Amino acid sequence: MNKVFSDYGWEDYIQLQKEDKKIVKKINELIKDIDRNGYEGMGKPEPLKHGLTGYWSRRVTEKDRLIYKIEDDTIYIIGCI
């Protein structure tokens, strides 16, 4: 699948590369798992509600989440917060 970051998602990802390589490694593992398993797998995937209906989150750490959706053959990542 193709991976597309929103501007905010990319900023989050770049900032984390400067701050915590361990979290970036976990995000990369989650993205690979999303590529293989869609909306199932690691990180306790959960559908989001309200203004983010259609998006899902996965746990990166106890407080941080990867926010994404899948359309056609593309993973859209809007946040790594």
Which ranges hold each PLM region?
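Compact soluble domain cores
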Residues: 24-37
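Enriched for short, Lys/Arg-rich terminal
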Residues: 2-4, 8-25, 42, 49, ...
